[in-house]
Design a protein with these regions (language model features):
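Short alpha-helical segments that sit at the start of domains
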Residues: 1-19
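Short acidic, hydrophobic short linear motifs in intrinsically disordered regions
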Residues: 22-32
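Alpha-helical residues within the helix-turn-helix
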Residues: 30, 34, 52-53
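Short amphipathic alpha-helical interaction segments
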Residues: 37-52
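A short, conserved structural fragment
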Residues: 52-61
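Accessory beta->alpha helical hairpin/"wing" motif in late/C-terminal subdomains of nucleic-acid enzymes
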Residues: 62-76
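Short, amphipathic alpha-helical interaction segments positioned at domain boundaries
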Residues: 72-86
Length: 86
């Protein structure tokens, strides 16, 4: 089972994976809320900062963030492990 922090990172990566354009933390928080996951803009920003450091997302300044190829691979791999039950 994936720990709480990793699950939140995967939720953010999922939102970014499903869009072509960069998204701001505000927009990501709104998308997560629509999916039934409450997360504040500040929390999203903190996770995005960590994801940027890990190379899973990149910042486009005030335009927002987008997922990298590495982020897509990480997301897909995590989903496979989650389905298998590791």
């Amino acid at each position: 089972m994936i720990e709480k922090q990793k699950r939140k990172e995967l939720l953010i990566l999922n939102v970014l994976k499903n869009t072509e354009m960069p998204l701001t933390s505000t927009r990501i928080a709104e998308e997560l809320k629509q999916l039934g996951h409450e997360m504040s803009e500040r929390t999203v920003r903190l996770y995005l900062s960590r994801l940027d450091e890990d190379g899973l997302t990149t910042s486009s300044g005030k335009k927002g963030h987008h997922i990298t190829e590495r982020g897509i691979s990480e997301f897909d791999l995590a989903k496979i492990f989650e389905r298998v039950g590791f």
